[in-house]
Amino acid sequence: MSGEEEATVREPLDLIRLSLDERIYVKLRSDRELRGKLHAFDQHLNMILGDVEETITTVEIDDETYEEIVRTTKRTIEFLFVRGDGVILVSPPLRTAA
Amino acid sequence: MSGVGEKVSGTTKTPADFLKSIRGRPVVVKLNSGVDYRGASLSRTLTCLDGYMNIAMEQTEEYVNGQLKNKYGDAFIRGNNVLYISTVNMTVADGA
C-alpha cells in the first residue's frame, strides 16, 4: 500500500518495556496514584510493583462553606499486583524538569 | 459505509486509516473521565498507538476542566479509558 512500513511497528507496550526495573508513576481509577518499581507487566497492564507508595486523593465539600477540602492518604506496600483494568496512565516518575 | 469520513483531510476513510495517519502528529486525547491530555508544545506528538487505542505520548500535559494539572515526560494511556483522539491543526499557538 503506502511506501514505507516498518517491519515491527512499535506499540505503546514496547515502550513500557523500556521502564522495566525502573521506578514509574501509575495513575489508577478512583483517584489513586502509585509510585513504585516496575517488575513485570502484561498486555492488560496487570503489573507487579515493588516498594510502592499509594496516594489516594479525596475531595470533600463542606456543607456550609462549600469549600473543597482536598485530602491525600498515603500508604506503602512492599510488593503489589495491580489489576490492569484499573490503570489509566503509566509514566516515568515526575521529575523537576529543567 | 462508503462516504463516511470523507470530510476528513485527504486519505483517511476508516478508523484504522486514521490511526495509521496520526503517528507523529500533535493530538488531544480525551478520556472517559473527562480529563484530557495534550502534547506540551506543537512539536510534542503522539509517539505510537495500537489497535486497543493504547497510546504513548511525549511531554504530555494533563488538563482537568481546562486547567493544567500535571506534566509527564512520557505517558502511556490504557486504551479502554480513551474517549477520543483528535488531531490538532498546526496554526499559531494560542497563548496558554
UniProtKB/Swiss-Prot annotation, chain A:
The modification N-acetylserine is found at S2. One of its GO terms (cellular component) is Lsm1-7-Pat1 complex. It is found in: Cytoplasm; Nucleus. The keyword Signal does not apply. It comes from the Eukaryota. Keywords: Acetylation, Cytoplasm, mRNA processing, mRNA splicing, Nucleus, Ribonucleoprotein, RNA-binding, Spliceosome. Residues 11-96 form the Sm domain. The keyword Transmembrane does not apply. SMART domains: Sm (SM00651). Expressed in roots, leaves, stems, flowers and siliques. GO terms for molecular function: RNA binding. InterPro entries: Lsm3, LSM_dom_sf, Sm, Sm-like_LSM3, Sm_dom_euk/arc. GO terms for biological process: deadenylation-dependent decapping of nuclear-transcribed mRNA; mRNA splicing, via spliceosome. Belongs to the snRNP Sm proteins family. PANTHER family: U6 SNRNA-ASSOCIATED SM-LIKE PROTEIN LSM3 (PTHR13110). Component of the heptameric LSM1-LSM7 complex that forms a seven-membered ring structure with a donut shape. The LSM subunits are arranged in the order LSM1, LSM2, LSM3, LSM6, LSM5, LSM7 and LSM4. Component of the heptameric LSM2-LSM8 complex that forms a seven-membered ring structure with a donut shape. The LSM subunits are arranged in the order LSM8, LSM2, LSM3, LSM6, LSM5, LSM7 and LSM4. LSM3B subunit interacts only with its two neighboring subunits, LSM2 and LSM6A or LSM6B. Component of LSM protein complexes, which are involved in RNA processing. Component of the cytoplasmic LSM1-LSM7 complex which is involved in mRNA degradation by promoting decapping and leading to accurate 5'-3' mRNA decay. The cytoplasmic LSM1-LSM7 complex regulates developmental gene expression by the decapping of specific development-related transcripts. Component of the nuclear LSM2-LSM8 complex which is involved splicing nuclear mRNAs. This is Sm-like protein LSM3B. It comes from Arabidopsis thaliana (Mouse-ear cress). The gene is LSM3B.
